[in-house]
């Protein structure tokens, strides 16, 4: 998917999973005047519905190019999202959840960084937010800040003074605030899929942590959730 590019426009690479948060981030970057290049990953996750959702969102929000990178993270295992022998939990537990994928955001941001350097983009957007902090170590502000420092040490562009910024505009927002922001920016949340185990038609289980957080966010925002359930 490639749209017409205004060559004078600043460029951004945006991690797009196909879920609520990343779709909102694409809309935010677009509203800030960026030419948006989105990157998704087929990494061996349980549900491929999110990849179809990412393509729909990219098309609807008019990104310049949408790229899907294939990775075999399920070959390593270690997560309920990539290993079907590990059950998706239906209750919140203590500590880091089994839905944590080892080093996932580090890997994803590294590949986004490579594409950004090729494109001459200086901004990389990711949809991590306050809801994720307690459970996922690679969603914390300290991680984002550290990755940005690394990006500017480890790249030709960074060494030559054309530094990168890792932008996490949802970092201090609740799920309700994210939904409200997206609605104002015209995000069609009916195109998105948040469920960890959505079926091939994108219908959600309504039981996993991601489904519950999404439903609670829409309810708190006072906005109808367009999620379909199986």
Swiss-Prot record:
Protein name from the UniProt record: 7-cyano-7-deazaguanine synthase
Q: What does the entry's cofactor note say about binding and number? A: Binds 1 zinc ion per subunit.
Q: What UniProt keywords are attached to this protein's entry?
A: ATP-binding, Ligase, Metal-binding, Nucleotide-binding, Queuosine biosynthesis, Zinc
Q: Which InterPro entries match?
A: QueC, Rossmann-like_a/b/a_fold
Recorded catalytic reaction(s): these are: 7-carboxy-7-deazaguanine + NH4(+) + ATP = 7-cyano-7-deazaguanine + ADP + phosphate + H2O + H(+)
Q: What class of enzyme is it?
A: ligase
Function of the molecule: Catalyzes the ATP-dependent conversion of 7-carboxy-7-deazaguanine (CDG) to 7-cyano-7-deazaguanine (preQ(0)).
What's this protein's family per the entry? Belongs to the QueC family.
What positions does the entry give for ATP binding? Answer: 16-26
GO MF terms on file?
ATP binding; ligase activity, forming carbon-nitrogen bonds; zinc ion binding
Tell me the Pfam families matching this sequence. Answer: QueC
Q: EC?
A: 6.3.4.20
Reported cofactor(s):
Zn(2+)
**What pathway is this protein a component of?**
Purine metabolism; 7-cyano-7-deazaguanine biosynthesis
Binding of Zn(2+) occurs at 195, 205, 208, 211
GO term, biological process aspect, one = queuosine biosynthetic process
Q: Which domain of life is it from?
A: Bacteria
Which NCBIfam families does the protein's record reference?
A: 7-cyano-7-deazaguanine synthase QueC
